[in-house]
């Protein structure tokens, strides 16, 4: 799970910081930087893959130079920094089945990507700083804040075990010497050294595959588990073919939905009933989800039975129903762990049923007060006041965080010049408070009450609609 992030130098982020909960809701109008945060999380996840930086950056929206914070038409940041704090599982295994119990489950990973030009003017990206360090148990209050004091001492020990001795670094950088060091787990472990002077074109973390570097491997696996759902109706509707086998894990576009459901049914027959019940609550008219092993056509197929006992193939279900079905299946999939990012989950949903899909997303998150709860996390972004209004149902639940994204003016000093930048800020919503709230530590960051947040979103929504109407009139 990601518990906090710091970003500097990426797109609209300058000295940006925010915290995450098991369920995090980010609301804001278009252009406020909501999608940029998802882009940052996606980039971090891809940086853990064993690929060169230029390939990873080329997958982002915009050119490589546009990904660095722009100061003016001709000036931009020369580096970008990401720092994430994580909660990882206590036990991990590598690709060869070797297992290890971690000393630390709370870890902080920092990566700095810098740019320079080669002799013919091409942009070169390289890793200029990388580190992985434990977060000390003393003073780490994230678990307590996310469980509102409901955590027993034994449960706290499960999530954040006591460790005797001085914390060690698992990846470290000495900038003056230009050396990144990867430290093997264990006392007096061997060291592998990589030299930044040779312009490392991929992260050290991406090359970790062995349990010998267990804490680094745990962070790599955590980043690789982050999924950004962009469910495609075409992929959701397709049966899973034996002959063109692509696995039984649901992809970000919804492929393998049928094979995943069949696997779940085979391991737990009750799960299919739970999925049917969830879907019937969300979509009126359906009462049962069926998955079949079609041996004649060598494929797994999903059907849905209506309340009048008519069987419908997944090929004829609406896009909205298919998206909801995919989430229902994920809820009952014990192989689903990690971060799930979802943009505008309210799309295609009857406004009167938004509370049901929010309940569904909440069920997709970890309950840290329950022993052995899988580390599941959901981050959504939305511009819907209805989604934010639904948060009142969880006003006393500290496992949920709500933020309002907006753009703020920042004066930045660089090379004896002052630049006026529009940067993304996240303003926390206090679900239990009344009136206006302001963060005393940062004068330019505002904390909202729920009513403030709703008024802000509704006002901006109206302003956007009026601007659209005026533009339409101007084109006549």
Specify the residue positions occupied by each region the protein language model found.
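Short glycine-/polar-rich loops that comprise or flank the Walker A/P-loop
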Residues: 80, 107, 224-225, 397-400
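Switch/communication elements of ASCE P-loop NTPase nucleotide-binding domains
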Residues: 1-50, 271-274, 278, 285-453
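C-terminal alpha-helical "lid" subdomain
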Residues: 438-476
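Short acidic, glycine-rich loop/turn motifs
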Residues: 9, 84-92, 134-136, 304-308
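Short beta-strand micro-motifs in enzyme catalytic cores
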Residues: 80-82, 227, 298-300
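Short, acidic Gly/Pro/Ser/Thr-rich loop/turn segments
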Residues: 89-91, 233-238, 410-412
């Amino acid at each position: 799970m990601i518990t906090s992030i710091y970003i500097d130098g990426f797109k609209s982020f300058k000295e940006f910081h925010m915290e995450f909960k098991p369920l995090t809701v980010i609301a804001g109008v278009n252009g406020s930087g909501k999608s940029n945060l998802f882009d940052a999380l996606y980039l971090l996840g891809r940086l853990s893959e064993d690929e060169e930086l230029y390939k990873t950056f080329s997958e982002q929206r915009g050119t490589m130079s546009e990904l660095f914070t722009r100061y003016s038409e001709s000036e931009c940041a020369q580096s970008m920094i990401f720092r994430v704090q994580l909660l990882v599982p206590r036990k991990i295994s590598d690709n060869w089945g070797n297992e290890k119990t971690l000393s630390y489950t709370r870890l902080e990973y920092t990566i700095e990507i810098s740019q320079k030009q080669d002799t013919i003017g091409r942009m070169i990206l390289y890793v200029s700083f990388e580190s992985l360090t434990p977060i000390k148990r003393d003073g780490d209050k994230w678990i307590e804040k996310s469980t509102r004091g409901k955590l027993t001492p034994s449960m706290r020990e499960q999530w954040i075990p006591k460790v005797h001795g001085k914390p060690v670094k698992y990846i470290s950088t000495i900038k003056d010497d230009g050396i990144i060091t990867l430290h093997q787990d264990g006392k007096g472990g061997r060291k592998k050294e990589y030299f930044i002077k040779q312009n490392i074109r991929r992260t050290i973390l991406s090359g970790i595959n062995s349990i010998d570097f267990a804490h680094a491997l745990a962070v790599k696996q955590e980043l690789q588990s982050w999924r950004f759902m962009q469910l495609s109706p075409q992929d959701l509707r397709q049966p899973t073919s034996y002959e063109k086998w692509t696995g039984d894990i649901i992809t970000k576009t919804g492929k393998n939905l049928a094979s995943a459901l069949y696997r779940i049914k085979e391991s737990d027959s009750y799960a299919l009933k739970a999925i049917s019940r969830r879907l019937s609550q969300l979509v009126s008219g359906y009462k049962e989800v069926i998955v079949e092993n079609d041996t004649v056509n060598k494929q797994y197929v999903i059907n849905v039975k209506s309340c009048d006992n008519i069987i419908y193939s997944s090929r004829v279900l609406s896009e909205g129903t298919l998206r909801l079905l995919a989430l229902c299946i994920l809820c009952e999939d014990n192989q689903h762990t990690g971060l799930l990012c979802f943009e505008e989950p309210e799309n295609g949903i009857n406004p009167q049923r938004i509370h049901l899909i929010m309940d569904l997303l909440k069920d997709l998150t970890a309950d840290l007060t329950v022993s052995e709860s899988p580390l599941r996390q959901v981050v959504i972004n939305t511009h819907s006041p209805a989604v934010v209004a639904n948060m009142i149902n969880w006003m006393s639940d500290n496992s949920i965080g709500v933020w309002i994204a907006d753009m703020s003016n920042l004066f930045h000093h660089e090379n004896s010049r002052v630049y006026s930048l529009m940067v993304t800020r996240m303003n926390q919503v206090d679900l239990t408070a009344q009136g206006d709230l302001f963060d005393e530590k940062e004068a330019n960051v505002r904390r909202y009450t729920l009513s403030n947040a709703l008024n802000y979103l509704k006002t901006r929504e109206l302003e956007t609609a009026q601007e659209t109407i005026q533009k339409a009139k101007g084109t006549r």
